[in-house]
UniProtKB/Swiss-Prot annotation:
Binding site for Mn(2+): 130, 132, 197
Recorded family membership: Belongs to the DXR family.
The protein's name in its UniProt record: 1-deoxy-D-xylulose 5-phosphate reductoisomerase
Organism: Pseudothermotoga lettingae (strain ATCC BAA-301 / DSM 14385 / NBRC 107922 / TMO) (Thermotoga lettingae)
Gene3D superfamilies: 1.10.1740.10, NAD(P)-binding Rossmann-like Domain
Amino acid sequence: MDNRTIVILGITGSIGIQTVEVIQSLGNFHILGGTYHKNKDLADAISQKHNLSNLISTSRGYDLAIEMLEKLRPDITLVAIPGFSSLILALKAIEVSKRVLLASKEALVCGGWLIKEKLKNCETNLIPVDSEHTALMQIYEEPFEEVIITSSGGALRDWELHNLHNAKPKDVLKHPVWKMGERITVDSATMVNKAFEVFEASEYFNIPISKIRVLIHKEGIVHAGILLCDSTIKLHLGFADMKVPIAYALTYPERKYKKPSWPDLVNTNLSFENVDETRYPAFKLLYEISENYAKRTAYNASDEIAVQNFLEEKIKFTDIPKVIEKVVESTNGQVRDLKDLIQIDKESRKKALEVIRCL
């Protein structure tokens, strides 16, 4: 494989850091540049180690990041920044790169149809980085009856329902399987993250929401499954290690990453449970809003505001779904373009703060 150039949007985040480590292991990739938000010290350390001449802070907006992509036109762009802005950057990355690795869920949640329209006009491969979607990509086969996405259930999965309102950020951030950023770890506990992944799977593979089933799988070994028409079930198993899907996305369709160990099938029990929608009220909203990008954008924006306020201990954990539901209910209409989505995102954040003030 010839050396490929890459820009990492979100180089100081969990996915960004692990991507840098994977690239060090693989070789054959040259990091041209990256973005960071506020962690300048870590960004400078990465830049010095890898001799990056293009390092952009996004703390004041994303215009410079867009300019960097236009100037560098890397072979690969990794979009690994949280929030709605990932949609804007993903659209630009599709324009300028041959391959876009998408780790930011919000891009497809809020603007899936925009991403797919852009892909029609560009010779770009969009590759998922999420463990569930890269797993599904590897086992996908038609015709099928149903696909399965698994969920750990988050840090509070074994708490009594009547105690959930007492959960503090330190409790919620103790994820039982994965090591991730703060927002996504909270989203795992509410299963908002899994709702995002259902939307993503629908967009990536053009699957109706009704054919995507989520199961609680506490062991974190099975990442996805597919039920085929002849009663066969295919499952994808692997360690809870994001470096594996990152490496696969970088080298697809080849496997270049070496990790000579596998889950112990003899001494591991695999269990599956249906989702308790009483425990995860924000999750069940996905079925009501799946066809409405305005409400999906409101869902994302209100969640982001609610999670931040929970992490700052301004609201209770059980207030998060209440904020989301009220904002989504108050969001009406359809969207025509990116401008409409940006406006809804802005309005939804404002509404979320208003709801929080009234709790």
